[in-house]
Amino acid sequence: MIIRRPEETWIQKCSMYTFVKRILDIVIALSVCLLLLPFFLLIILLLRISGEGEVFYRQTRIGQYNKEFRIFKFATMVRDSLNIGTGAITLRNDPRVTPVGKYLRITKINELPQVLNVLLGDMSIVGPRPLVMSTFNAYPALVQKEIYQSKPGITGVGSIIYRDEEKLISASSIEPKIYYEKVIAPHKGEVELWYNKHKSVLTDVKIIFITGWVILFPQSNLIYKSFKDLPKRDF
């Protein structure tokens, strides 16, 4: 007599995924801290002797279940930048960005201190990007309700697809905040919700690989080749 093993429930699968994801997050975050420590020290030195001497930038972001937390980033802009110019919207060649900060932003190195948020449990390596309240409010109500059922991530499908967000906003004749709200936010919300529905260890591993790939090859369309049903961007 063959006894069939009962299929795992959605809750069991979700719990297993959450457990494995947390282990991977800790392993990757610790590895980054240890391997890149000398590099981090060099960046800290450069930031101390250039610009305004600021090293880390702490900012309140929306996290899992829409709870706020404080994010770590390398400082790339002048002090009080949120209250200057376009606020939370950053433009290409934004005058608020410091000389060193410009290169940190292009290479996304400014995001690496968020491994500390990963170790603290506020963030994951992969997930929807954590937003400030003003840009979070640009999302449709359904997206606001669902997007942070997953922990926010250092990278994710939204981060990859909109890696040229600053360029898009700068090239538009529409006022930046309106362009973000009317054009970018609706589609960006769609792709972040796509991740929530398709998240798995394999999906996360693919996204991590694709993140590295598009940093080296910015024009690559690998994200859409890897995930065929990902909502397409038509602008």
Question: Can you describe what each PLM-predicted range is?
Answer:
Residues 1, 125, 138, 145, ...:
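Soluble, non-transmembrane catalytic domains of enzymes that act on hydrophobic metabolites at membranes
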Residues 46, 87-88, 144-148, 179-180, ...:
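Short, P/G- and charge-enriched loop/turn segments at secondary-structure junctions
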Residues 29, 57, 98-102, 134, ...:
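Positions in alpha-helical segments
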Residues 2-3, 8-81, 195-235:
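A hydrophobic, helix-centered structural microdomain
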Residues 90-153, 208:
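A short, structured surface patch at a secondary-structure boundary
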Residues 55, 65, 123, 129, ...:
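Gly/Ser/Thr-rich beta-alpha loop segments that engage phosphate groups in nucleotides
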Residues 57-96, 158-186, 190:
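Short, glycine-rich, amphipathic interfacial segments at transmembrane boundaries or analogous
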Residues 43, 58, 85-86, 126-128, ...:
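Short, hydrophobic secondary-structure boundary micro-motifs
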